[in-house]
Amino acid sequence: MANPRDTLKLLREIEKTYPCTFIRGNKENYWIHHRKNSEEEWKTGTTTTGMLAYNFAQLSDEDIDFFEAMPISKEMRYGNLPVFTICHGSPLVVNQSLRPDYEYIDDVVEKFTTQMVICGHFHIQTSYERKGKLVINPGAIGVPLHSAGKAQFLILSDENMQWKTEFVTVPYDVDKTLEDMDKEELFQ
């Protein structure tokens, strides 16, 4: 993503008006690690590490402190509705994928403390039940996979004191995004 400073500024503005919960993901962990181990070199260019290096160069110590303070998971409570957990990878490990086809899923799911977990990390909208627990991935806004280039997210709503989930896929201005990336010379 081009202009991470703009994204962080927007998030901090939203946080002033609305209650927000931020969860640390693997990218934040990479930046935290890199600040502590700056002698490790990242490649530049169009690779994942190049994008990490580009973003890290834009971040301040205050930003990294903000990331470091984020939990990797959190139980969410809303009135009398069922408690659920949000996380990036899994509630246990920040970069552990909860893809339903992975062999270890049953063992991991058994350790969940809530009946519903909303995770990210693998960027594919999905919902499945294992061991009586519901695992949901809302997809992704910035790097959605299997979405025909559209942004994805999830809406949770109360339906008779139970959570109703609605997957949403919307178009966004891909050309503008590519233009922003080109201005930042991210294709060099």
Residue ranges and their predicted role:
Residues 21-26, 87, 116-123, 135-139:
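Active-site neighborhood of phospho(di)ester-bond hydrolases with catalytic His/Asp-centered motifs
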Residues 47-83:
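Metallo-beta-lactamase
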Residues 42-46, 80-112, 144:
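Active-site-proximal segments of metal-dependent phosphoesterases and phosphodiesterases across multiple
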Residues 1-2, 27-32, 92, 116-129, ...:
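Active-site environment of divalent metal-dependent phosphoester hydrolases
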Residues 1-57, 61:
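Core catalytic region of metal-dependent phosphoesterases/phosphodiesterases
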Residues 73-75, 86, 127, 153-155:
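Conserved hydrophobic/aromatic beta-strand scaffold that supports enzyme active sites
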Residues 128-188:
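Acidic, His/Gly-rich catalytic cores of divalent-metal-dependent hydrolytic chemistry
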